[in-house]
Design a protein with these regions (language model features):
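Alpha-helical bundle regulatory/interaction domains
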Residues: 1-40, 44-204
Length: 204
């Protein structure tokens, strides 16, 4: 994934801009860590090793990340920003899921290692919350729709279901089908009211 993707320019919130800040450097760190974790567990990696493999200084690393465990959380936010967060804005449901998972599947070993650490629990807490906030913003600010109790329920359920379901996809032995098929199945699980409302992007 490149740092110069099709970004949602209509909502320049500080937290979104923060995700994009120094994106090229951060992506270099992600790629370096993914390579290192092919042979070395995350807990045994040092920041010095990561910096050497990334071609950056320690000061540059700490300007980008609080610690090595923050790298996975940033990458998830970065991928979501150009993928599922664009559903209903610039992408359909299928396009959003496919773009997101096509990026994540490149880093299966990286996320498998990161998920073994207790620090990963902060990601567990943040992903569903961020997805709910984004879906609410999309409905309200992009489609100009009112948020009914039913829609809020559907958003809550979908965010939880996405978070629990999507990681299973990367188990090719359990689900020996194409990514395209998995994305289609995911689309079929989206509550119909929510699906119909956001499947047509407002920006192309």
């Amino acid at each position: 994934m490149q740092a110069n993707g099709t970004w949602d320019k209509a909502l320049n919130k500080p937290e979104k801009l923060g995700i994009l800040s120094n994106a090229e450097t951060k992506l270099n760190v992600v790629n370096a860590m993914a390579d290192l974790m092919e042979t070395t567990p995350l807990e045994k990696l040092t920041v010095s090793q990561i910096c050497k493999a990334s071609g950056i200084s320690r000061s540059s690393f700490y300007r980008c990340f609080e610690d090595k465990y923050a790298v996975a959380q940033w990458h998830i936010q970065f991928v979501h920003l150009n993928g599922v967060d664009q559903i209903g804005r610039t992408l359909s449901w299928y396009e959003g899921y496919f773009r997101t998972e096509a990026d994540f599947v490149k880093y299966k070993r990286f996320y498998a290692g990161a998920s073994k650490k207790s620090d990963y629990n902060t990601i567990d807490e943040s992903i569903p919350r961020c997805r709910k906030e984004t879906l609410i913003e999309t409905i309200r600010d992009y489609h100009g729709k009112k948020l009914t109790t039913k829609l809020l329920f559907e958003i809550e359920a979908l965010a939880a279901m996405e978070f629990k379901t999507l990681p299973w996809w990367h188990d090719d032995a359990k689900y020996p089908v194409t990514l395209e098929q998995k994305c289609q199945w995911m689309c079929e699980l989206v509550p119909r009211d929510l699906f119909d409302m956001l499947n047509q992007p407002v920006i192309r």
